[in-house]
Amino acid sequence: MGVIQAIDRLMTNPIPDGQVDDILRPQGESPLLQKGYVTTSVDALLNWARTGSMWPMTFGLACCAVEMMHAGAARLDLDRYGIVFRPSPRQSDVMIVAGTLVNKMAPALRKVYDQMPDPKWVISMGSCANGGGYYHYSYSVVRGCDRIVPVDVYVPGCPPTAEALVYGILQLQKKIWRTKTIAG
């Protein structure tokens, strides 16, 4: 037998005699898929990647934005959690709404939220963003940004401390870790 025939024999896939006993078993029933092992592993991998690389887009409307900037400074350093502030909604997956949301700003908030790619999350920071705050009874104030966009985490306070925002971000990471994207 020549060299070419030997290489050709090695490179050709063998023909199976019967049903292939593969891990997924396309012809038969798969015990792994029935119990959800494969999809939960993929969910865990995706959620691990999402919690380690959250990119928030800041939507600072009032004094709470100063505390949000303080959270990104050297003392608390959000970079060690994998959090990098992004200026564009198309590059971010978390929106932090900080401050008083007025009626004229509500359509802009919704437009920015709609421009974010899925999956996306929202953190409402401060009493004004949570429920109107001090200006709750004003005719021009939206009584909570949850009337405009779905909110995942509420950070209370007027203004909330930077540590409270970091705690809210950690709570959002726990929430992301518990979500089931594929096996759901």
UniProtKB/Swiss-Prot annotation:
Membrane topology term reads: Peripheral membrane protein
Does this UniProt record's set of keywords contain Membrane? yes
Domain of life from the UniProt record: Bacteria
Residues noted as binding [4Fe-4S] cluster in the record, renumbered to the chain: C63, C64, C128, C158
The EC code for this enzyme is: 7.1.1.-
The cellular location(s) given in this protein's UniProt record come to: Cell inner membrane
Function, please? Answer: NDH-1 shuttles electrons from NADH, via FMN and iron-sulfur (Fe-S) centers, to quinones in the respiratory chain. The immediate electron acceptor for the enzyme in this species is believed to be ubiquinone. Couples the redox reaction to proton translocation (for every two electrons transferred, four hydrogen ions are translocated across the cytoplasmic membrane), and thus conserves the redox energy in a proton gradient.
Q: Which GO BP terms, alphabetically?
A: aerobic respiration; electron transport coupled proton transport
NCBIfam families registered for this protein in UniProt: nuoB_fam (TIGR01957), PRK06411.1 (NF005012)
Q: Which cofactor does it need?
A: [4Fe-4S] cluster
Taxonomic lineage is: Bacteria, Pseudomonadati, Pseudomonadota, Gammaproteobacteria, Lysobacterales
Quaternary state and partners of this protein?
NDH-1 is composed of 14 different subunits. Subunits NuoB, C, D, E, F, and G constitute the peripheral sector of the complex.
Give the protein's recorded name.
NADH-quinone oxidoreductase subunit B
- Give the similarity note: Belongs to the complex I 20 kDa subunit family.
Q: Which UniProt keywords apply?
A: 4Fe-4S, Cell inner membrane, Cell membrane, Iron, Iron-sulfur, Membrane, Metal-binding, NAD, Quinone, Translocase, Transport, Ubiquinone
Q: Which reaction does it catalyse?
A: a quinone + NADH + 5 H(+)(in) = a quinol + NAD(+) + 4 H(+)(out)
GO-annotated cellular components:
plasma membrane; respiratory chain complex I
* SUPFAM superfamilies xref list: HydA/Nqo6-like
Record's InterPro entries?
Answer: NADH_UbQ_OxRdtase-like_20kDa, NADH_UQ_OxRdtase_20Kd_su
Cofactor binding remark: Binds 1 [4Fe-4S] cluster.
User: Listed GO molecular functions?
Assistant: 4 iron, 4 sulfur cluster binding; iron ion binding; NADH dehydrogenase (ubiquinone) activity; NADH:ubiquinone reductase (non-electrogenic) activity; quinone binding
